[in-house]
Amino acid sequence: AFCCPSGWSAYDQNCY
C-alpha cells in the first residue's frame, strides 16, 4: 500500500 503524507486523504487518487 502507498503511505499517504500527512493531510492527504486515504481515498485520494494517488493514495491507496
Swiss-Prot record:
Posttranslational modification: N-glycosylated.
Keywords, comma-separated and alphabetical: Blood coagulation cascade activating toxin, Calcium, Disulfide bond, Glycoprotein, Hemostasis impairing toxin, Metal-binding, Secreted, Toxin
Entry GO terms, CC: extracellular region
Highest taxon of the lineage: Eukaryota
Residues that span the membrane, as ranges: none
Residues in C-type lectin domain copies: 11-16
Family: Belongs to the snaclec family.
Further details from the record: Calcium is required for ligand binding.
Protein's recorded name: Snaclec factor X-activator 2 light chain 2
Source species: Vipera ammodytes ammodytes
Lineage: Eukaryota, Metazoa, Chordata, Craniata, Vertebrata
